[in-house]
C-alpha cells in the first residue's frame, strides 16, 4: 500500500531498501491517471519495492529540496540515494521498467 510522506517522514521512508517516490498533485491529471498502475505494480512487487507518495501541494519543502519542479515526477531510490528520475507524462511501460529496475537490485 502506498505511504503518504510528509517533510518529517520523507527521509525515514526512503532511507532503506528500494523506493519508488511519486510526486503528484490533486489537479495533475497524468498523476491521477497513473496511480492505479503504480498501486498494482507495488502489489506485484510483493514488498520488494515501497511506494512513497508526496503531495506537492502539501510538501513544498520536500519538492524544493529534491528539485522537483514539474508533475508528475517519479524518483527511484535505493537506501536513500537517487538512482533515476522520470518527469512529465511517462508511459506505463516506463513505470513498469522503473519497478523492474528497483526489484532487480541493479543500477538504473
Region spans (language model):
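N-terminal leader/targeting and pre-domain segments
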Residues: 1-17, 101-108
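Hydrophobic/aromatic anchor residues within beta-strands of the central parallel beta-sheet
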Residues: 5, 49-51
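Short active-site neighborhood of thiol/selenol oxidoreductases, capturing the structured segment around
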Residues: 14-26
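Hydrophobic beta-strand anchors of alpha/beta hydrolase catalytic cores
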Residues: 20-21, 51, 74
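Typically the conserved alpha-helix immediately C-terminal to a functionally engaged Cys/Sec
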Residues: 30-45
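Structural microenvironment flanking redox-active thiols in thiol-disulfide oxidoreductases
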Residues: 54-62
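Structural micro-motif
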Residues: 60, 66-75
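Non-catalytic, surface beta->alpha helical segment in thiol-disulfide oxidoreductase systems
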Residues: 75-108
Amino acid at each position: 500500500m502506498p505511504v503518504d510522506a510528509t517533510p518529517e517522514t520523507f527521509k525515514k521512508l526512503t532511507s532503506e531498501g528500494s523506493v519508488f517516490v511519486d510526486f503528484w498533485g490533486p489537479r495533475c491529471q497524468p498523476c491521477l491517471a497513473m496511480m492505479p498502475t503504480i498501486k498494482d505494480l507495488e502489489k506485484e512487487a510483493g514488498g520488494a519495492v515501497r511506494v512513497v507518495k508526496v503531495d506537492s501541494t502539501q510538501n513544498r519543502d520536500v519538492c524544493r529540496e529534491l528539485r522537483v519542479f514539474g508533475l508528475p515526477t517519479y524518483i527511484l531510490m535505493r537506501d536513500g540515494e537517487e538512482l533515476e528520475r522520470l518527469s512529465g507524462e511517462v508511459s506505463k511501460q516506463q513505470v513498469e521498467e522503473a519497478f523492474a529496475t528497483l526489484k532487480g537490485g541493479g543500477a538504473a
